[in-house]
Amino acid sequence: MKLQESESVERRYINQYAMVAALTMPQNFIGILGRASAKTTQFQAMRIQQAVEECPGAPFVWVTDTYSNLHKNVIPSVLEGLRFLGWEMDREFVIDRQPPIEWQRQMYNVIDKYKQVMTFWNGFTFTFVSLDRPSIGAGRSYVGLFGDEVKYWPEEKFTNIRKAVRGYRARYGDSPWYRSLSLTSDMPNPNHTGEYTWMMKLVKLMNKEKIKLLLQTGQALNEARRRYAMSLQADDERAQQLSERNMRRWEERWTELRRGTTLFMVASTLINADVLGEEFFQEEIAAGLEGIDTNLLSIPQKLTADQKFYVTMTARDFYQDGTDNAVLEQHDYGWEQDCTVLRHLDLRMPLDGGMDDGNMKSMVFGQQRGREYRVMKEIYTLPPENERQLADKFLEYF
């Protein structure tokens, strides 16, 4: 008998690497994945769904580098990924507002403010925290940590936020999600200021033999679930009892193996080639832009001699308060930002600009105030866009 699609059985398409991540679903997932490989919408969204279903009432935290990135990219991508899995706003979850009272009753801890909090129907919560505004998550304890674009996190900031992932062992200590990590990023390049390679050290956490055993167990569990679903469709009571009993046994084995297990994965954008299409890669290669080997192919880079100057730059050379978060909070997630978010922009003063021409055309803009000079914004275009589109972006932003 062939398994038929129904209300309880649906067909989903994911790439092979996402399938491995789904079949193993380990306590820790560290994914260094090429650009446009569906890091958030597939890999992270599937882990979110599993964590929600297995940890009702648990508080989790999602961390990103800046509040601006959180507002514009991260939360919209999370929402898109959950929609892909069939979960909708106001049905399975709400965000930025107080949930229904029956949802609140299932929360393990009390929350008094719901700004940047996603709440699910069973009391599971996500608090979204940016490293440039860590006060939002200060003083709280979390069961697990999710994060994207980890290459932009300084190691010491990750270490500090990791200390908050300690909570509620009495309730969740036996869960594979207790003190779990779900981290994704594309390959960091040490030649680029502000990118950090410490994530590569986490490969030491992975036991290859245990991952192989976990994958085999996940495949056996998937087959047991398929047979159970077939018995339900056949309306065979005896077959249902036997297949359900077998499925529960495999679920116990699978859950036990997931505890304390880490999957460290490095993959290129080619894992998503079926979705992106051949033209995507042809255009990227034809443009000849720097970073294809790192951003798309996930090939680690060594520090070149001419870039060692930039590594000497420290935090004192940068300012962290350039975005006016109060302006962001007035707009919906995913809002296309303009110059009103620039905290230090003086509309009465001239705006300096400098352009770097080439395949990638970029312009940076800044202003001087006394002895301080702040670079405030970069605008760029990639082929086939040219100077006209670059000028349009400037006009739209400023």
Mark where each language-model region is.
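Walker B catalytic acidic pair
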Residues: 148-149
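Gly/Thr-rich phosphate-binding beta-strand-loop-beta motif of the actin/hexokinase/Hsp70
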Residues: 342-370
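Inter-Walker segment of RecA-like/P-loop motor cores
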Residues: 71-143
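ASCE P-loop NTPase helicase motor core
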Residues: 152-272
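Pre-P-loop entry segment of helicase/translocase ATPase cores
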Residues: 1-29
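Conserved P-loop
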Residues: 28-99
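ATPase catalytic-site recognition across NTP-hydrolyzing enzymes
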Residues: 259-260, 266-353
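Nucleic-acid-processing active sites and adjacent nucleic-acid-binding tracks
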Residues: 347, 365-398
